[in-house]
Amino acid sequence: MKKLFNEFAGNIDTYIMFKIKEKTAQLKDELTKKGRAPISLSMGAPTTMPPKFLLDATKEALDEKGMHTYSNPKGEKYLLDAIQTRMKNRFGVDIETNEICSLIGSKEGIANFLRGIISPTTNEQEKDIILIPDPSYASYGEMIKVSGGKSYSMPLTHKNNYMPDLDEVWANLQKDGLNPDKVKAMLINYPNNPLGASCTFEYLQKVVEFCKKHDILLMSDAAYADMYFEEEYKPHSALEVEGAKDMTVEFHSFSKPYAMTGWRIGWVCGNKEIVQQFAKLKSTIDSGIFKPLQKAAAKILNSKEGDEYIVWANQEIKKKADYFVKAFTEELNWEIKNVPTATFYQWLPVPKKYANATDFCNALLEKSGVVMVPGDAFGKYGAGFVRVSIVCSLEELQEVVRRMKEDGFTYNAD
């Protein structure tokens, strides 16, 4: 058979989470027999049930007439109105409904948006460049690759407080022989996956100023904007910055704050011309979101029940995060420099006895049944670290610590 997939689609890697899930499944029976049934700290997905209010609203919508037909790919009016209100109430951002487009999850939105703005070519010198954080969400680089572009890393390190020096990035890009005129967009993600780090409003102002100066689009992935522990670290929207709407689009998700990752619903908002052009692209790719999901999402977004659920969920994550940091430092002697202020992620250095993060994760899985993700899956600046997702129960976290201590997985173990 002739080669079917083009150079871009044919060269993408399997998503790291699927690789880990597959390996864990292969070892499950063996681990369970020896009292080490797998405990996953790998997937970035809440394991709690969504709010009852949301489930009830969905059931109610299922019986409404007209709910089972095609929906508007831009989003039904009731959803767009709810998003408009949410952006104003949560961030103080004035958005018109024609500056919003619904998404089948923010992952789909970002992938299709990149497909729309990148001009694909196999000529390395001519490829459009997207600036991305490093470490960052593992799919960003592959999304760009499959769209026919190339990514360029903006290092997030403890030294720069996970807010890269943009002028330094720009200078390094040119030192590396790349053409700055080919930079199409900058993609940022705060609070950050995998680090759990947030940025300041002042930094967002610098980002907007930088993008305007160099005439590049700002894409802000705000999937974790409602997952934070303290009011002083409450995440901002990039659209709060004066003039940001001139060259910014921001992606939001219902998945994380309401524990509805499988529902696949989110939105993008920002510059009207850009969002409307993207909506045209979307209309050729999909037929929108199932209406009952939109109806329920619209109801939860600005409800007392929804806000109370977010507060409760964040308090639960904070309890687990506090336990995790205390147990790993005091019982397992770990050195933790980065203590997250948001999300359900922890970012740990790999014990010195291991050559790399993959070796450590494999040993931990095979001996203790504990599943973590190698940091270099999120970029070259993730080398030497692992990402831990504390979405399991507190009791399971306690079992993780017990197993690791019993099996010799302390930070300074020989």
Q: Where are the model-predicted features located?
A:
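PLP-dependent enzyme catalytic core of the Aspartate aminotransferase-like
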Residues: 85, 89, 174, 354, ...
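Active-site PLP attachment segment
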Residues: 240-277, 289, 384
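N-terminal small-domain helix-loop-helix segment of the aminotransferase-like
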Residues: 3-105, 112, 300-303, 411-414
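Conserved glycine-rich beta-strand-loop-beta hairpin in the small C-terminal domain of fold type I
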Residues: 294, 298, 314-325, 336-350
